[in-house]
């Protein structure tokens, strides 16, 4: 589950608990869709009050994969007002910076802008061999990587710079710091690396 969605569940925790969501078909639907296991259902049903059952469900959901939040929304057929509240909170969270971006401390207007040649150069200096899977995650191909290597056979940094410039040319306005941030996370590199590009 995305950090933003976890935050939404956390912020509405008490309100959701008061609705006692576990009394209807919610658990069965989540089980049917593979979000909850049989053990989870037993554990939740073993709780003595509806509030505790709902709280335990809210504790379990964040660790149940990327589809957990959307499937939870789908499960709330009997609670349309709760579903609307969650959707609204999620939309508001989307207009704020997602939690993962707050960590980097980068304002949203910069996250939505494209890096300059100088900034790409700074990123290239700091990236190791993970630059290849990163540019693949950004949408370049193995052929692009091969060409960058062929054009600069003896200079890895120049290969990296050319790869990111190709990415920026190809994706235009979509080639943003936000995309770089997501790319760094995809290859498990600390996204705070972007802060050095902005110094």
Curated annotation (Swiss-Prot):
Q: Which InterPro entries would you find in this protein's record?
A: CARD, CARD_RAIDD, CRADD, CRADD_Death, DEATH-like_dom_sf, Death_dom
Impact upon substituting residue 65 to A: Loss of interaction with CASP2
| Variant or mutagenesis effect after changing residue 154 to A | Partial loss of interaction with PIDD1
The record places domain Death at: 116-188
SMART domains from the UniProt entry: CARD, DEATH
Which molecular-function annotations from GO does this UniProt entry contain?
death domain binding; protease binding; protein-macromolecule adaptor activity
GO biological process: one example = positive regulation of apoptotic signaling pathway
Entry's localization field = Cytoplasm; Nucleus
This chain's function reads: Adapter protein that associates with PIDD1 and the caspase CASP2 to form the PIDDosome, a complex that activates CASP2 and triggers apoptosis. Also recruits CASP2 to the TNFR-1 signaling complex through its interaction with RIPK1 and TRADD and may play a role in the tumor necrosis factor-mediated signaling pathway.
* Written domain comment of the UniProt record: The Death domain mediates the interaction with PIDD1 and the formation of a complex composed of 5 PIDD1 and 7 CRADD proteins which in turn probably recruit 7 CASP2 to form the PIDDosome. The Death domain mediates a direct interaction with the Death domain of RIPK1.
What protein is this chain from?
Death domain-containing protein CRADD
In its UniProt entry, the species of origin is given as Homo sapiens
